[in-house]
Amino acid sequence: MKAVMVAAAVALSAGAVATCLLAPEYYGYLLGTLATTALVGVGLNVLLGLAGEISLGQGGFLALGAYGVAILTTKAGLNFWEALPLAVVLVAAISAVLSIPALRVTGPYLAMVTIAFGFIVESVSIEWRGLTGGASGLTGIPAPFGTGGTALLACGFCAVALVGFRFFAQSPLGLAMQATASAPAAARSIGIDPLPVRTVAFVVAAAAAGLAGGLQAALTGFIAPSSFPFSQSILFLLVVVVGGAGRMLGPLIGSAVVVFLPEVLAGLAEYRLLVFGAGLLIVLWLAPGGIAGAIDRLLTRKKLSSAFPANVELALAHIAKSGGSLRVEGVRVAFGGVVAVASVDVEARSGRITSVIGPNGAGKTTLLNLVSGFQVPDSGIVCVGSRTITAKPAHEVARDGLARTFQTAQPFANLRVLDNVRLGLLRGAWRGEAEVTLARALLALVGYSGPEDRPAATLSHVDRRLVEIARALGSAPDVLLLDEPAAGLNDSDTRKLGALLQRLARAGIALVLIEHDMTLVMSISDEIVVLDAGRRIAAGPPASIRADPLVKAAYLGGTTTVRPVAARAAGSRLLDVEKLSAGYGPIPVLDQIGLCVARGETVAVLGPNGAGKSTLMKCLSGLIRPVTGNIGFGGAALARLPAYRVARAGLILVPEGRQVFPRLTVAENLVLGASRRNDFDQSEIDSMLDRFPKLRARLHTAAGLLSGGEQQMLAVARGLLARPEILLLDEPSLGLAPAVAAELFGQLRKLREEGVTLLIVDQMADHVLAVADRAYVLGGGRVAAQGVATEMRDKMLDDTYFGARPAAVN
């Protein structure tokens, strides 16, 4: 393949030389235009293909470069060789200044900023007549050679830029750009500051456009504002997209399409643009990754390398620590009036595993974000060893010795596995082969045995976790924070993960683990800190935490004052779930779930965080499609129906987190609940207000201004107005004060007595068991126990929440 590439390069070079020196002048001009267009494309390929940012202002930078050369040669008396580098430096400086406000925004907002910049350049070039010649432009721009020679010079610059892009993309800075584009939060967690990285990409793209503009001015000998229309910036973007963003030859191929295709279609007269546009659409449809990407897939069948021999001891020596600890004192943060973390203290010592647990909404991930620099605490102190890292941004925290992983694994999907880990090696410059050897050793340490040159986007879920941990270890951290690393892993992989974490602790790293798998937590933790409603309620070794009544109350709800109801005889089956499996992409969550609900029955679904309760509710309501299994509802199959059709069938979800329409009033929210019905009567709203009297005084208030309890009552009332066959309630007590939760469950008890069919998922076992007829307990994505609600609070329930891993119940 390399021989073919070399032969093609030689042939193209020979053809370019022959065209510029021997062919008619117009063909030399076309080739020069191709080269300058490709040169702009190479720069934009750095910005879009590597850094993932869109600019529609490249025409403005092209104009600045062209006017710079024209003014310096025609008015300042400089020759071309003096004017060209000065013009490029000028464009780079202007782009660096522009990047200060422009790169505070990303995506479409950056595109709009650069569009405005292009219009400013056009306006200045028209109005500043004394310098730019106004609308008439500037003529007599000297060229270093004739048309053919100048075109050949442009081709030379283009060739150097294309080769330079190939090497730049694999450099540390190029990989950092790709990492920032792929997963900016993960990039910050390994010490990469996205702002300067994007700034460099922006300046490089602008400088390349300025260089192309200077060459274009010399090639044409004349420039005017009309030479740089806004449509040209769009064409430059098409050059990269059609050619293949991120591909070395993408800009060259895209430029050939944009420059030569209109010439080929010249005979079509007024239909030329129509056919040209249709052709571009067809190309984008057939090759969404660009022409270069399609060619690469057709011509290359790359065999992934097998695992290289690796020295695990080298990795252990790299991460070995003699000390270092994490100290968190009095950390507090509030969002609006809600205190998410309230004066929490945590100490994680070197060589020990400290786990942070708690029910949903306890503040665990918020605490981790405060410690790792992704959020700023209102008060408190965070220290790594003797270094205070309070309120430092995430990339500085990473450089101070604290690494982290994420709740959903975030490898850099567009990079190879090996490059993911290489980017984690922050402490010291890259060291060539020695750095590659160390990266391989880290992969071996965590247990990754797949190909090192596999794109991370193609990895299985467990391998994505392992690569993320290896990347975090690359910085040889003093403290490693792990946010639910066992989520989605099977029992075997979870046990291997536990052994790995214990090995890392023995190497001297202070590990902080946030995890819902209580079997893992109880088996490997040296100390456990328990949070509830943002407050620390307990701390100690696993045995004491498991027996602590405050911890049990936090998870199971304590002793409820609501008297349990007697189970009733089941009516006809209304909902029948068989062998249901589901997940999120490669992450399995539910495994062969089976349950049923009879008409008029209230059924509870319990289980610890991460057991799959909310995923089950999303499957039942059509929000996610199950992988396998059946959902029977009144004789109809719902498993493949979209959510709106499931709702029309009568399965109504009150989602987790309330999710009212915040800008609509309470009354408008209620009316929307009945929108699928043709027999809705306004008096039904009065009935709901009688059921939830607190809503009556807030009827014309925006729902977003209600308290949490009022929003939950509104969400339930909205669901009831749909007249559901079954009302699904997902964590209705989440985030509610105890008194408010008790009031809400009192209303659910009344609904049960009225014969409304309810399926309730909730963390507070005591409250929901006091209302339910029957209950299912989920553990590890499977049904761990089921039975009559009044008999369910036994050792099986405790084990599911606090550490035993029961076998599935069929």
Regions found by a protein language model. Give the residues of each.
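Cytosolic juxtamembrane regulatory segments of multi-pass membrane proteins
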Residues: F308-H318
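A generic short-segment signal for beta-strand/edge and adjacent turn/coil regions
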Residues: G15-A16, Y29-L30, N79-F80, E122, ...
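Transmembrane alpha-helices and adjacent helix-loop boundaries
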Residues: M1-A310
